[in-house]
Amino acid sequence: MDSYNILVVEDDQDINRLLCKILEGGGYCCRPAFSGSEAVLWAEQYYYDLILLDLMLPGLTGEEFIEQMRRKKTMPIIVLSAKAGLEDRVNVLRLGADDFIPKPFDNAEVLARVEAQLRRYKQFSGGGGSAVLTHGDLTLDREGVTVTAAGKPVTVTAREFDILTLLMEHPKKVFTREQLYEQVWGGEYMGDDNTVNVHISNLRAKLAKASPAEYIKTVWGIGFKMSDL
């Protein structure tokens, strides 16, 4: 098993210790952080493959931490919080989180979701197939984990990169929300369109800042595909 480094950001020492124990039992290396400010320091000094994040933190909040990280980093961020209302979940996904686990959590589910995120992240950052995908003036580099539109760099999250990779691998195929969720998130689709819609919306907005071209087309009543060239 590859060795992955995970930053666990949780101000409750008992919960932080439990999460580290769960993850270390799965073979991961964990660094505990107990505030948003401390987490920023660790994230700037060292490389982490994934961040497990509480929202209600002293000082810098979880939401502020996500915003700060997404200015320059793309690793998966899983939010784990008691703030589990629909508005809260949609908000953190829009900010750039890749997944959300409500508290109280199930130990096995935490480990499974971490494994799924890292598996997908590893696949798109170094997976098979052509290293560079292009669609018009849109370019995606698997090895460099970069996206450019009209020659301009586009900063995307791990999940957004994964979605775009899948769409660009099959530019003629229309993907339903269920197909996108099951292939990108690696879990069973439960009929909630918000997760997929939010990530598609965020991805489109970022691409639009670099170029006015429409890259991702909505096929009404079905799903999404790459736009026709």
Language-model-detected regions and their locations in the chain:
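N-terminal/domain-start alpha-helical segments
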Residues: 1-125
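Pre-signature/interface helix of ABC/ABC-like ATPase nucleotide-binding domains
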Residues: 67, 131, 152-154, 182, ...
